[in-house]
Amino acid sequence: MTGGQPRTREQRKVDTLAKLAAPAADVWVATAAVDAGGHAGSYLVPLSLAWIDQRAVLATEAGSVTAGNITSHGGVRLGLGPTRDVVMIDAELEHVYSLDEAPAGLARGYAAQAGWDPRKSGESMRFLVLRPLRIQAWREADELPGRTLMRGGAWIP
């Protein structure tokens, strides 16, 4: 990914949306929390992603640390792609669906993009619908300026 000129904001947005909509897109999901004893903990796990209606959709066990952190605190950071072609997303929890509550289109869309169907993995799975607040994308140091593509939940023109 080295060489050439830095991509324009428009090209970065096109590339970012293509990555988000790609089949079997996986993201690193970073969350943090403070436990009852006052000890801070950070957690990083890989999860499958679906990009549905401009939202990041994850599926995980309801009792997982990641689901607990997201549902308790609302904030999450997602990392997609290798370090020399990365997309970083800061997002907030918009909705949690149990398997039987999930809209059919969301569940089907997730299964189609992620390549697996959480509805076949047990009743404790949850869909987490995340609204992106900030999206950044860059490849090399020459793309650090202008890396922010979305701010406050709105694409920057």
Locate the predicted segments by residue.
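Hydrophobic small-molecule pocket/channel-lining residues, especially in calycin-type beta-barrels
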Residues: 14, 21, 27, 79-81, ...
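Short, intrinsically disordered, mixed-charge
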Residues: 71-76, 108-112
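Short, basic/aromatic recognition patches
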Residues: 2-28
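Short beta-strand segments
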Residues: 24-62, 68-70, 76-80, 88-92
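Generic structural signal for secondary-structure transition and capping sites
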Residues: 25-26, 75, 115, 135
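Short secondary-structure boundary/capping segments
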Residues: 18-19, 48, 68, 118-120
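Charged, gly/pro-rich active-site loop segments
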Residues: 1-11, 85-157
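A generic alpha-helix structural signal
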Residues: 17-21, 67, 103-111
